[in-house]
Amino acid sequence: MVKIRLTRLGRHKLPFFRIVVIDSRARRDGAYIEKVGTYEPFEGVVNINEEIALSWLKKGAQPSDTVKNLLREQGVWKKFMDSKVQSKKEHNANKVKKEVKKPEAKKAAASKPASKPSASKSASQKKTVSKK
């Protein structure tokens, strides 16, 4: 699984973080796939490349809790969720169009055999009457 998380840089008691896409099994400061941005906690500066972050989120990368908060602050998470909702609406609209076409064919096929069972019902009614 691929995650978006922080890797620590900087010196003692003055941290600096890179926001990176990394395999979930890799070490905290291990080799990463791609750099998404940076975070300086003491200065409160966050730099995120939105295009790269959105592309990895759409591919299924899971952000850590801290990174998710940073993405929310920058507005990237909202863009991702909006695009996700929009794609679901489009998918559901296409699904409804396909379902509308199928029942028409089923109704036509269902109406033909319906006449045959009605004759068998009348025969079964006659049998029950004769038993009384």
Swiss-Prot record:
Would I find Cell membrane among this entry's keywords?
no
Q: Positions of the region Disordered?
A: 82-132
Pfam families linked to this entry: Ribosomal_S16
Top-level taxon of origin: Bacteria
Instruction: Please give the Gene3D superfamilies that the UniProt record associates with this protein.
Output: 3.30.1320.10
Its GO CC terms are:
cytoplasm; small ribosomal subunit
Q: Which InterPro entries match?
A: Ribosomal_bS16, Ribosomal_bS16_CS, Ribosomal_bS16_dom_sf
Q: What keywords is this UniProt entry annotated with?
A: Ribonucleoprotein, Ribosomal protein
Q: What biological process terms from GO does the record include?
A: translation
Molecular function GO labels: structural constituent of ribosome
Instruction: Return the Low complexity bias intervals.
Output: 108-132
Which ranges does the record mark as transmembrane?
none
Question: Where do Basic and acidic residues bias regions lie?
Answer: 82-107
Q: Family membership, please give it.
A: Belongs to the bacterial ribosomal protein bS16 family.
Which NCBIfam families does the entry link to? S16
Q: What protein does this entry describe? A: Small ribosomal subunit protein bS16
- Per the UniProt record, the source organism is Malacoplasma penetrans (strain HF-2)
